[in-house]
Design a protein with these regions (language model features):
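Polysaccharide-binding surfaces and accessory modules of carbohydrate-active proteins
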Residues: 1-136, 152
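Short, structured beta-strand/loop micro-motifs enriched in basic residues and often containing a Trp
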Residues: 140-152
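Short Pro-Gly-centered flexible turn/kink motifs
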Residues: 156-167
Length: 167
């Protein structure tokens, strides 16, 4: 196989319900490998009904403009039976280049008011970043990452023994 090894470090903080995730990719093989995407965090099994996504829109003279969206407003209508709910729809929020807050802040908030629960995330990077939410059967999946090949033409050649760290 490729000889690529991924190690995930999770840092917890006393008294605060926060965790920091960092992934390290090491080429333990004998040939160069090209990395085009590395997830920083993935959360699946997010309850489908009753969620709201808060997206922080940003601009040069209008910063921190949080907007609340229902998933129906974002194009996730319930059109299929419960056992096969999958719209193939993806909501993507991202930035390319070295101005990390050009259109959006590198964060988001998923709220479920009925259960008084929520999940907030922040991508710690001063360059390109990406997050997406998709539906899979009867739940949502959140993927958070730094730069990737599709949005920002990111690629990293890992020579044997080299390591790359996610944002």
């Amino acid at each position: 196989l490729t000889g690529v090894c991924v190690q995930t470090d999770i840092q917890f903080y006393d008294g605060v319900p926060v965790a920091r995730f960092v992934n390290h990719v090491t080429n333990e093989g004998e040939e160069e490998q090209v990395l085009t995407y590395l997830s920083s965090f993935t959360c699946s099994g997010i309850k489908r009904d009753g969620n709201f996504l808060y997206i922080p829109h940003n601009g040069w003279q209008k910063e921190l403009n949080w907007r609340r969206y229902s998933f129906e407003e974002l194009g996730f209508p319930v059109t299929q039976t419960k056992s096969i709910r999958r719209s193939s729809k993806t909501i993507e929020v991202y930035n390319t280049g070295n101005w990390s807050t050009k259109e959006y802040l590198p964060m988001g908030f998923l709220s479920h008011p009925e259960s008084d629960a929520g999940l907030i995330w922040q991508i710690e990077n001063n360059g390109s970043w990406h997050y997406e939410i998709a539906d899979q059967n009867d739940h949502y999946v959140l993927n958070v990452s730094g730069p990737n090949e599709i949005q920002s033409h990111f690629s990293k050649v890992l020579r044997p023994g080299e390591t790359f760290e996610s944002v």
